[in-house]
Structures are given as structure tokens and as C-alpha cells.
Regions:
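GH16 jelly-roll
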Residues: 1-238
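Extracellular/luminal Pro/Thr/Ser-rich low-complexity repeat and linker "mucin-like" segments
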Residues: 238-257
Length: 257
């Protein structure tokens, strides 16, 4: 899959799992407690704002999980100009409004590579908090399988848990997250984006290449690992029907859905 922004053709575009309802199918949503990952090659260019994110079924005003964003303008003149932003926006029960960037400055990760040069895996995982699984969650962001930052709703009492309690009360635990992939050219300067012509007046085509999007849920059943074939040795991968290999703890395994 390749989503491309062409200046003469259009300025922005998006793919959304919930939009399957426009083609004769039920809108597609994914479980509240799940791990969502995307492997993609995403351009790091001034004025280009592309990225995958998750929206709560009741709207982004309840919860938005930004799996990847690049704000090139914001960091271009800093000591670490190349950074990944993985922001968390959750309804704030104290103010009655959407809480922006509730995971604070820790949402930024310094990159030592060009994300537009090769594929990397960006992800978010939402786990029930074992202390209070019906009211609270632990949200972890990931880059290439490693956790970049973690947010625990219980640390703020019941201030940021509407996305959990609402889904459970309305029976939507299995159908909570809409997965969207946005391609966009330009954004407000105050948002740290700017416009590409401010740096490159000749920029015309920008592509974000997506290898895959995968969603996993947990199960305590230990998987049966298939025998590794003699050939091809280097290209061998576990079947999607078996299990995603990473393990969260000793007795919980991620299974693809």
C-alpha cells in the first residue's frame, strides 16, 4: 500500500477502518485491549504531516492515540532535529474537554535514522491495569518493538478513563478503535508543521509506503511454534495463524486477529 500526496492533485487524504461501512460492510473497529502496529516508510520532510493513528468509536474527542507523527518544523533547529512524536489525547473528566498530549514531553523520541529511507514499525498497545481492569488501562507506545513511553490512567485517578468505562458500559470492548492512516501536506505553523514550499518550492510528490498493519490481542495459551523449515532459512516467518513472537510477560502471548 502506498498513500501519496500530489500537490496538483490533492492536499490531503486518509484511510480509515471504520469507512468500510461505505462499501456495504460493517464499519471495522478493533478491541479496546490490543496491540496495533504498522510497518511503514514515512517521509521526514518539512511541511509533510503523514501518520497512523487510532480514534475511539465515539470520536477523537473521547480518545485519540497518535501512533506516529513528525513535526519537522518544531525541532529543525534543535540539537536533535529528528524526532518521533507519539501523542495521547484523552477526554479529561475534570475539565469536560479533550486533554491534549496528556503523556507529556515523554511522547517525543529522538531518532538516529531517517524514517523515510527504510521501513520501521510503529505501535501502540492498550492493556487493562491489573489493579482495576474495568476502569483503568496502561498505554504503551512502541518503535521497532521497543517501548518508548508508557501512560497509566490510574496515576490520575478517574480523570482520563472515559474511553475505557464508556466502551465497557456500551459493550464495545471488542469494537473500540478505528485505525486511520493520514497523508497530508501542510499544517499550521503553531502546530510545528508549516508548509513545504517554505523550504522546497519544487516539491511535488511525497509518498508514505505501508508494508502492513497488524492487530494483536492477548491469550494465556502458550502457542505451538511450528518447526523451522530447511529453506528458506533467512526468510522464515511464523504463520499469522499461530502467534506474533513477542511476549509481554511469561504467560501472556500476542495473537493476531
Amino acid at each position: 500500500l502506498s498513500t501519496a500526496s500530489t500537490r496538483e492533485g490533492w492536499w490531503s487524504g486518509a484511510l480509515s477502518s471504520r469507512d468500510t461501512d461505505k462499501y456495504g460492510y460493517q464499519g471495522k473497529y478493533y478491541p479496546l485491549h490490543s496491540r496495533i502496529e504498522i510497518r511503514a516508510k514515512i517521509p521526514y520532510i518539512y511541511g509533510i504531516w503523514m501518520g497512523p493513528w487510532c480514534r475511539h468509536y465515539a470520536g477523537a474527542s473521547v480518545a485519540e492515540l497518535d501512533i506516529e507523527e513528525f513535526f519537522v518544523k518544531e525541532f529543525e533547529n534543535t540539537a536533535s532535529p529528528r524526532r518521533l512524536s507519539q501523542a495521547l489525547h484523552l477526554h479529561d473528566n475534570k475539565t469536560g474537554n479533550l486533554g491534549i498530549n496528556v503523556n507529556g514531553y515523554g511522547r517525543h523520541t529522538v531518532l538516529d535514522f531517517d524514517p523515510g529511507a527504510d521501513f520501521h514499525t510503529y505501535g501502540v498497545q492498550v492493556d487493562p491495569d491489573p489493579v482495576s481492569p474495568d476502569k483503568h488501562a496502561i498505554i504503551s507506545y512502541l518503535l521497532d518493538g521497543k517501548v518508548t513511553n508508557t501512560f497509566k490512567t490510574i496515576d490520575y485517578d478517574d480523570r482520563y478513563n472515559t474511553f475505557i468505562t464508556k466502551a465497557i458500559a456500551e459493550g464495545r470492548e471488542k469494537r473500540t478503535w478505528d485505525i486511520a492512516i493520514t497523508g497530508q501536506i501542510g499544517g499550521k505553523n503553531e502546530n510545528g508543521i508549516g508548509y513545504p514550499e517554505d523550504r522546497n518550492a519544487n516539491l511535488r510528490n511525497v509518498s508514505m509506503d505501508v508494508d502492513w498493519v497488524r492487530v494483536f490481542t492477548r491469550d494465556e495459551t502458550e502457542p505451538e511454534i511450528p518447526e523451522k523449515p530447511e529453506y528458506p532459512v533467512e526468510k522464515f516467518d511464523y504463520s499469522r495463524a499461530v502467534v506474533e513472537k513477542r511476549v509481554f510477560d511469561s504467560k501472556m502471548y500476542w495473537y493476531p486477529i
